[in-house]
Amino acid sequence: MGISRDSMHKRRATGGKQKAWRKKRKYELGRQPANTKLSSNKTVRRVRVRGGNVKWRALRLDTGNYSWGSEAVTRKTRILDVVYNASNNELVRTQTLVKSAIVQVDAAPFKQWYLTHYGVDIGRKKKTPAAKKDNAEGQEVEAAAEETKKSNHVTRKLEKRKEGRTLDPHIEEQFGSGRLLACISSRPGQCGRADGYILEGKELEFYMKKLQRKKGKSAVA
């Protein structure tokens, strides 16, 4: 039969008279959803649409460009997991990438950028006093080596950048785990990409609460 977007085949709820029947038209066609899956075997299909235009239907993806708004930086990174979807839990269970889905992305590219831009290694776990003593000598040598690598100009530049540096504690916490919460803002089934932005501020707090509540429910069940 095929998916049709016309209303001719629908019954009237009021029991009113049907229109005169005619065959389906090409411009009334519908296509099944892409249901883009999270998979390393990247698959994108070319679809010819009305007017000779082209859409890119992503069937499997695992990477995307994600922007960190407050730092005005964008990096290509791996999508690790789909954790929340406001419209449908089934899309989380089946790891489906759709617009506005909340995903976890790899923090490594952003961590690397932060280190080169500010000279600060974020997300490092604090060690116990015993471990500190053992590693103190090795760290001193490493620190000395790092200092010798940087010129005065670079050091001055980093110090100036550090003056205005602010970092959301929630984001810093996520850097420790190596996974950042992000939102997909592109439409993978239409443009063939799963791009988005890192969650920050009130939006991040909102979704963290949602995930915490979801985790609590599953623990009770």
Swiss-Prot record:
Any one GO biological process: ribosome assembly
Start-end of Basic residues biased regions: 8-26
Highest taxon in the source lineage: Eukaryota
A Pfam family matched in the record: Ribosomal_S8e
CDD domains: Ribosomal_S8e_like (cd11380)
Region (Disordered): 1-41, 128-169
GO molecular function: structural constituent of ribosome
Protein name: Small ribosomal subunit protein eS8
